[in-house]
Amino acid sequence: MKINRTMTIETNEIQIGDRIQVGHYTATCQALPGEGLALFLLDQYLDKAMQMNKRSTNKGGYQESDLREELNSEKILKDFTGLELAPFDNGDLLRLPFYGEMFGHDDWYNSGAVEPDDCEQWPLMKERANRVAERKGESYEWGWLQNKYVRSASAFCVVRYHGDAAGWVASSSIGVRPAFLIKLS
């Protein structure tokens, strides 16, 4: 009989697929983007659903969104205390995933529906089940991605509750599943 066991160990050698505890959430390593860094994504959406913008617009993209500001506020960052977070290139400690990281550059992306990114799909996201996440108190949830849905001035791309992609109105409150970098010792 073959049995898979999950074990907890102390190590500084992080691998893709390793899981850590972040407050009352868990997060899984998705990539090792550089020397001494590991990129993690929460396995669940944050407890509170959030709007990308208070108004239904994708003007300014994720960089100028209300959600980006809220995601990097002390109110949210307090859940990540105890981790040695490293900033992304834009200085943020938390960010949303890009379409390419979740889905790769698939047919929908190549149709021109999605704001372009230069990201490769994370290995674990090749399995649809890994793109699906829940939010506390909800049986299913949709979640924001950074990319604009370019066929509508009011929408951004999302991961739907069954792991496929869509566009959704920016003023809707849905799931937020942050990615973050950790400095490895």
Label every PLM stretch briefly.
Residues 1-185:
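Collagenous Gly-X-Y triple-helix signature in extracellular proteins
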